[in-house]
Amino acid sequence: MMLKDIDRFFWEKPEPVRSCLSALRYLIKSYDPAIEEVWQYSTPFYRLGKKRLCYIWIEKKTGRPYLGIVNGKLIDHPQLIAEKRLRMKILLLDAGEDLPVELIMEILNMAAALP
């Protein structure tokens, strides 16, 4: 069976990153029934209606997974970092720890409320 690019993105990651990303994927997709997962820019993006809400990626320097918020610059949250990004902010995750579910839901709520 041939994997789709979006599924391959998750499958090809080593553990524990694979499990962390898969759990994050499930959490985002279960956030709202209207969430749509799409493959853009060689990464999983999640749309709510026509709005790109967030994406999943791996930090190149450390290999840590993160949740990227598309219009994160409009969100003031101490856990979100911009680094050199102009529009996006990210929430770094520790693949060896349980996902901070309440924090992720809080940030998704803030992102979904943006215009």
Regions found by a protein language model. Give the residues of each.
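Charge-dense, helix-prone N-terminal extensions
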Residues: 1-115
